[in-house]
Amino acid sequence: MSKGCQTQGPLSELEKAIDVIIDVFHQYSRREGDKDTLTRKELKLLIEKQLANYLKHVKNQVSIDQIFKDLDNNKDQQLSFGEVMLLIIRVTVATHEHLHFCEDHQQQHQHQHQHQHNH
């Protein structure tokens, strides 16, 4: 960030997370072609290196191609920050739902154990 663009106070947790998302996008967007968009190759690398745990099923080029096609709203064969954010949003929502599912399943499991032990 340039001096004129710095924030006034310390960043909140959410603001830090936003900065990390922007920084990670730029780590990959600056590798080839336009410095502020992702090519198919840059998207593949970003998914492999930064979303490996959350997108375990995305292993092959066909999956990458489909994700790229789904995100490339203006069909210009590159992904803007806004287009990549659609992927981040989808992964975040899916992760949130998965965590709740795991939490609910764990509580049900514990609840069943309590009933079994109280007999």
From Swiss-Prot:
EF-hand domain residues: 23-58, 59-94
Residue sites binding Ca(2+) 1 per the record: T37, E42
Name the record gives this protein: Protein MRP-126
Keyword Glycoprotein part of the UniProt annotation: no
Binding site for Ca(2+) 2: D72, N74, D76, Q78, E83
Alphabetized CDD domains for the sequence: calgranulins (cd05030)
Free-text tissue specificity from the UniProt record: Expressed in v-myb-transformed myelomonocytic cells.
Family matches, as Gene3D superfamilies: EF-hand
Record field: transmembrane: none
Entry keyword set: Calcium, Metal-binding, Repeat
Superkingdom assignment: Eukaryota
Record organism: Gallus gallus (Chicken)
Record-level GO cellular component terms: cytoplasm
Keyword S-adenosyl-L-methionine: no
GO biological process, one term: endothelial cell migration
GO molecular function, one term: calcium ion binding
